[in-house]
């Protein structure tokens, strides 16, 4: 079985059946494409540890550590899947996966978010930034939202694993939403649309919009739509929010995933201790 066919089989029999996210599917396809480009579409039975070692070295030239790790991990998952159905391939336990370097999420203060919103060059930009921060939703979830879906400052999204999740917005977000929608003259059902063709905005367009707003606000951090999700979570805990409630709001399947935000708050406590404790 060719490498490309092996990844395809994994997608069809595992990802789609398990209702995995589009992000998981995209990562699988990117890993397959990159591996085939490097090794050629050889039989996966002939894939060796040396192939993987050389591929990993090649990835490190122009990919981030997280991307390298993600690609190697995805290959290991696919081979593990084949191994379990008695396919003649490399033992997945022999494939070394680079360790994830521990890092705290980048987040913005409430003041920085407010500066970003005010730096938005139109009401659509202000609404998008405000919505991402107020609700903590993912970029992919924002793109799928439709007009009329937010009622009484509440709405439901379908998150990872096709699970519905209740989300909320604040009055500031509602204000910018109403301003933006009042300007719209198109018939698109999408909540946010491109000014050029009035179709649903793409992830790339929104990422660029957020990055430019951060630059105009004078923020030096690397800001993405996901940074606003991190900011929502961090500031929720800083205001003594309950970790389990936060996990539900974020749509995390495990409380362990949400717990990474407690480390940011722990850092706050340590800084306060160092600043105010005197011997």
Spans of model-derived segments:
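Conserved catalytic core of the tyrosine transesterase superfamily
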Residues: 1-279
């Amino acid at each position: 079985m060719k490498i490309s066919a092996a990844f395809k089989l994994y997608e069809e029999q595992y990802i789609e059946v398990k209702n995995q996210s589009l992000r998981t599917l995209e990562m699988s396809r990117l890993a397959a494409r990159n591996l085939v480009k490097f090794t050629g579409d050889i039989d996966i039975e002939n894939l060796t540890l040396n192939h993987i070692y050389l591929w990993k070295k090649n990835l490190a030239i122009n990919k981030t550590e997280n991307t390298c790790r993600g690609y190697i991990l995805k290959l290991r998952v696919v081979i593990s899947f084949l191994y379990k159905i008695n396919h003649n391939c490399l033992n997945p336990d022999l494939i070394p996966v680079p360790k994830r370097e521990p890092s705290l999420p980048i987040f913005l203060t409430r003041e920085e978010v407010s500066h970003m919103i005010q730096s938005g060059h139109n009401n659509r930009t202000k609404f998008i930034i405000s919505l991402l921060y107020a609700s903590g939703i993912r970029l992919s979830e924002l793109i799928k939202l439709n007009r009329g879906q937010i009622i009484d400052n509440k709405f439901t999204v379908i998150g990872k694993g096709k699970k519905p999740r209740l989300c909320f917005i604040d009055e500031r977000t509602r204000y910018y939403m109403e301003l933006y929608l009042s300007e719209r003259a198109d018939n698109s059902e999408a909540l946010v649309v491109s000014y050029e063709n009035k179709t649903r905005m793409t992830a790339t367009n929104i990422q660029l919009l957020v990055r430019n707003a951060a630059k105009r606000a004078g923020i030096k951090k690397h800001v993405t739509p996901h940074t606003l999700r991190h900011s929502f979570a961090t500031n929720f805990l800083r205001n003594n929010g309950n970790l389990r409630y936060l996990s539900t709001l974020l749509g995390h399947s495990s409380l362990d995933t949400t717990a990474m935000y407690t480390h940011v708050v722990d850092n706050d406590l340590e800084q306060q201790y160092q600043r105010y404790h005197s011997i």
